[in-house]
Amino acid sequence: EGQTPDYEPVFISIAVIMVISLLIVLFKVDENKMSAERIAEEKRWGIIEEEKTEDESGGARLSAPVRKSLIFLLFSVAFWYMAYNAVTTAFSRYASEMWGMEGGSFAGALMVASVGALVSFIPVGIVSSRFGRKKVILFGVVLLGLSFFAGFLFKQPNFAVNIVFFLVGVAWASINVNSYPMVVEMCRGSDIGKFTGTYYTFSMAAQVFTPILSGWFLEHVGYWTLFPYAVCFCAAAFVTMTMVRHGDSKPEIAKSRLEAFDVDD
């Protein structure tokens, strides 16, 4: 009695939010107007002629070093999605089998992770502009792996689990705020759509495949494998991410305090 929660209000709420979001996009986002403003701004700054020249020349392909960085970045994307989505997908079963949690009480930890990500997005963006995207992503991958390792150490649920999952959210924000901009940074403006599709192909493929692979381990080896599985893919993501040499963005730092005031008229 009372062990099976009613999920209907949750699904209804999500559906309502999605409909509201769709209506906002339909009626408040004027894509044609924004495109016209962008073109006018490009003409004002003399950018549009440069883009036409590039397109007429056939659109230069990515150089070998940039292409190599892009490939490693895309594999990193796949690996950290393999780690994160394995845990979020199977955590309910893990919490039930390993910790004896019932009645949807496991949802609190996942909610804390979402809150951790939500409160971190803006600070992470600020920190990334100061220290660079790659460093913040590597920090996020390490924090994610350590958090999953800490989750593996818990033999029963307690308040510290919420702290760990809050850190999972912070780590996930550190990764996601910076990964897609790095992909965009490597491509030309006319190729953004193509590379966006490639980025989401890798991320979605990982999200589809990881429940199958992690589920096999859970079923044939044991539920204890969930967090070690995630840690292994975090380690793989860290290795591939260290091989990325392009797509980062850091502001130029003046060599001296006086140079900070050296601005052309």
Feature annotation, model-predicted:
Residues V142-Q156:
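C-terminal ends and interior cores of transmembrane alpha-helices
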Residues E31-L74, R257-D265:
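Juxtamembrane intracellular "pre-TM" segments in multi-pass secondary transporters
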Residues V119-R133, L218:
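Helix-to-loop junctions at the C-terminal end of transmembrane segments
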Residues E1-V16, W216-C234:
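A membrane-interface helix-boundary motif in multi-pass transporters
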